[in-house]
Amino acid sequence: MKFNFSTIFNILFFLFTLIEANSNGETVKLITSDGIVYSYAVYTKTLAPARVVVKTISYTTTRVYPITLANSVVSSTTEKITEVSTVSASEQVSATQTNSLVSTSTVSTISPTISSGSSTSSSSTYDIESSQSIESSGTSSATAEPSASSGFRLTSSSAFVSSTAPFSSQLSSSSSSETSSSSFSTSSSSAPLSLTSSSSSSSSFATIITLAPSSSKSGNSQLTLASSSSTSAVESSQTGSTIARTTSTLVPSSSVDTTSRATTSMPLESSSTQSISVSSSDGTCYVFYDDDDYYSTVYLTNPSQSVDAATTITSTNTIYATVTI
């Protein structure tokens, strides 16, 4: 047999091609019937795992509600709402990006501050701290000194703070998930004071202290702090919230003892009930105190709002946002 050089070269080229195809896993050589060699490469790519982005946004909204009392004194309630929003997004690094649903949560902290007054010398400040459970028993210690005028002077004092005529009242009540502190300052010698600790949506606690000075203008008077308990259940058609309220009355009596002080403890448990309801279809809720001349009007504009006292509105806001990465 006679073989020329080109035939031997083609046979050797075919053998080397098969060896190269077996040794290289990624490159596969194919030979077709027309003698043309085709080759292709197989490429694989591993996608990176998903990356989670968490972003927290905090901002504060202040709302002021004007309130008109019976003596034509306009008082304002400042509601400070701190909303913390957590934005979570899931990102997958690939040819197309996929973002997951954004989750948002809101925490509301309400600190109302109410001030009203006329031109007399009596003033008082109360601090209320709210913690867990709706049924809690706490005591409130109150001390007062008369001043040399027709009324008496009550000054708030807290721990490590001293004052000439101390009157301190600290109430610890229960709430469900929200902490509220209220500070009240009034300058009327006979107006009732409302102390309020609010809860999230189902219960709240209110304390009303009525200061009723005697008509004696002598500098000698003795304050007797009489404690009574009552409960007010709010039966509102929109919220169904419950208000527990404790009423205490300070009644000064004539005495020649200028150094005497009265101290008592006020249990937070209640015995009697009273109903307050929404009286008109436009969402107006009238809340009355024991004194019929002292009242205010609260407008309920949202089903999530509830009335804790005459000057406090508690609402829960949820904010939803969508972020595209």
Swiss-Prot record:
One of its GO terms (cellular component) is fungal-type vacuole. It is a lipid-anchor; GPI-anchor. Induction: Expressed periodically during cell division. Requires ACE2, CBK1, MOB2 and SWI5. Expression is also increased under microgravity conditions. Residues 309-325 form a propeptide. Residues 109-148, 167-200, 215-279 are annotated as: Disordered. Transmembrane segments: none annotated. InterPro entries: DSE2. One of its GO terms (molecular function) is glucosidase activity. Present with 907 molecules/cell in log phase SD medium. This is Protein DSE2. It comes from Saccharomyces cerevisiae (strain ATCC 204508 / S288c) (Baker's yeast). The lineage of its organism: Eukaryota, Fungi, Dikarya, Ascomycota, Saccharomycotina.
